[in-house]
């Protein structure tokens, strides 16, 4: 049909959707191993076209001509965590080290999407662990957060997944993760509470068994 051909033509003529990239023109994006195949991008774009019609819009008007393509590319980026392995990322930067005090990376920016409404939630993640002969490159902690956040999520599961990945790879004496986030599904719709912030935590090892360790962690992440 004419509508489908319009969408397909836009996709076929776009190098970002034909295996050479997904969302931008820089080298990192063009070689992004997490990109989606062109046929999936085309299917997603056609679905967005249908959604636009469903809400009463005209997908053929000037301002919306490229919207299906743009939304598909955005969703591919926002869900790229499905195509990345956080444990493999951690394993690339594990080092033997005798340090045995707490390691904390706090105020890691997170952006994710609620799986119930596909609306954003965003905030900060605080990640700590106590080494047991092994440490990991600090940037890898932030990358693990990023990989799990770039999926459809609930904050509770996201917090646990970060903890479990670090625990499974490093086998530390304990892991502590706290996430504080604002959910657009509570701000833009539903109860419409603009200032609500959700806090979740997931602990293991000494962060559970030692009250002083847990207390130190929670004190350190306070503003």
Swiss-Prot record:
Pathway: Cofactor biosynthesis; 7,8-dihydroneopterin triphosphate biosynthesis; 7,8-dihydroneopterin triphosphate from GTP: step 1/1. Keywords: GTP-binding, Hydrolase, Metal-binding, Nucleotide-binding, One-carbon metabolism, Zinc. Its EC number is 3.5.4.16. GO terms for cellular component: cytoplasm. It is an enzyme of class 3 (hydrolase). One of its GO terms (biological process) is tetrahydrobiopterin biosynthetic process. The keyword Transit peptide does not apply. One of its GO terms (molecular function) is GTP cyclohydrolase I activity. It catalyses: GTP + H2O = 7,8-dihydroneopterin 3'-triphosphate + formate + H(+). Coiled coil: none annotated. Zn(2+) binds at residues 114, 117, 185. It comes from the Bacteria. Pfam families: GTP_cyclohydroI. The keyword Metal-binding applies. Homomer. HAMAP family: FolE (MF_00223). Belongs to the GTP cyclohydrolase I family. This is GTP cyclohydrolase 1.
């Amino acid at each position: 049909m004419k509508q489908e051909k319009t969408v397909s033509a836009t996709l076929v003529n776009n190098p970002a959707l034909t295996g050479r990239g997904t969302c931008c023109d820089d080298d990192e994006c063009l070689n992004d191993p997490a990109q989606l195949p062109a046929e999936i991008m085309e299917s997603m774009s056609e679905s967005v076209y249908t959604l636009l019609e469903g809400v009463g819009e005209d997908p053929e008007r000037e301002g919306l001509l490229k919207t299906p393509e743009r939304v598909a590319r955005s969703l591919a980026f926002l869900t790229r965590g499905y195509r990345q392995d956080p444990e493999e990322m951690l394993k690339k930067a594990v080092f033997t080290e005798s340090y045995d005090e707490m390691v904390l990376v706090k105020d890691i920016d997170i952006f994710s999407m609620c799986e119930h409404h596909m609306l954003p939630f965003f905030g900060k993640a605080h990640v700590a662990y106590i080494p047991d002969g092994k440490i990991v490159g600090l940037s890898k902690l932030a990358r693990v957060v990023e990989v799990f956040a770039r999926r459809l999520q609930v904050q509770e599961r996201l917090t646990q997944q970060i903890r479990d990945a670090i625990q499974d790879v490093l086998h530390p004496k304990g892991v502590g993760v706290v996430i504080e986030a604002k959910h657009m599904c509570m701000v833009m719709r539903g109860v419409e509470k603009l200032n609500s912030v959700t806090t979740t935590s997931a602990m293991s090892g000494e962060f559970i068994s030692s009250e002083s360790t847990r207390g130190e962690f929670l004190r350190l992440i306070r503003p």
